[in-house]
From Swiss-Prot:
Keywords linked to the UniProt accession: Chaperone, Cytoplasm, Ribosome biogenesis, rRNA processing
Superkingdom, natural source: Bacteria
Quaternary structure note: Binds ribosomal protein uS19.
Protein name: Ribosome maturation factor RimM
InterPro entries named in the record: PRC_barrel-like_sf (IPR011033), PRC_RimM (IPR056792), RimM (IPR011961), RimM_N (IPR002676), RimM_N_sf (IPR036976), Transl_B-barrel_sf (IPR009000)
SUPFAM superfamilies in UniProt: PRC-barrel domain, Translation proteins
GO MF, any single term: ribosome binding
Domain notes from UniProt: The PRC barrel domain binds ribosomal protein uS19.
Gene that encodes the chain: rimM
Membrane-spanning intervals of the chain: none
One of the GO biological process terms: ribosomal small subunit biogenesis
Function recorded in the entry: An accessory protein needed during the final step in the assembly of 30S ribosomal subunit, possibly for assembly of the head region. Essential for efficient processing of 16S rRNA. May be needed both before and after RbfA during the maturation of 16S rRNA. It has affinity for free ribosomal 30S subunits but not for 70S ribosomes.
Location within or outside the cell: Cytoplasm
Length: 175
């Protein structure tokens, strides 16, 4: 399958314990992807995705990490062997979103324009999730700017036109 047929939902960052569990750093706002049993895919560097069965998963309290158990991973050595693997789902398995909700993968790469002047400010290069979502915008000089992803500051997101508009407070792009 082509790369656009997959959505990266996380990455295996470490083994957890001795019985084949792994820690996953998620890149999705849908925790059920790591808590509900079912088919997922693992992709090691320079390899095609391989189907795996998620047996169980749980979030580590107070951390943005999940501990999951895949069916074929039985011990710590096997768990260590998949460290660095991307965890994938098929693009067709994307959850339906409400109005003004977006998939991270749809935001990365959008062109960013000033809401008032329509001047190009840069491109969305990343999204950080914490107390509130923050867009990382990289300008033409490769300088990175952090923009709170809230309606008051980002009033326009147009996925069809591959753009968003920022009504930035003074100085946000001048720092």
């Amino acid at each position: 399958m082509a790369e656009q047929d997959w959505i990266i939902i996380g990455q295996v960052v470490a083994a957890q314990g001795l019985k084949g569990e792994v820690r996953i750093n998620p890149s999705t706002d849908f925790p059920e992807r790591f808590e509900v049993p079912g088919q997922r895919w693992l992709q090691l560097p320079n390899q095609d995705p391989q189907s795996v069965e998620l047996e169980r998963g749980r979030q580590i309290p107070g951390k943005n990490l999940f501990v999951v158990k895949f069916e074929h991973i039985q011990d710590r050595t096997q768990a260590e062997n998949i460290r660095g693997a991307k965890v994938l789902v098929r693009a067709g398995d994307r959850p339906e979103l409400e109005a003004d909700e977006y998939h991270v993968s749809d935001l990365i790469g959008l062109e960013v324009f000033d809401y008032n002047t329509q001047a190009k400010l840069g491109i969305v290069s990343d999204l950080y999730t914490a107390a509130q979502d923050v867009l990382e915008v990289t300008d033409a000089n490769q300088k990175k700017h952090l923009v709170p992803f809230v309606k008051a500051i980002v009033p326009v997101v147009d996925l069809v036109e591959n753009r968003l508009e920022v009504d930035a407070p003074p100085g946000l792009f001048e720092i």
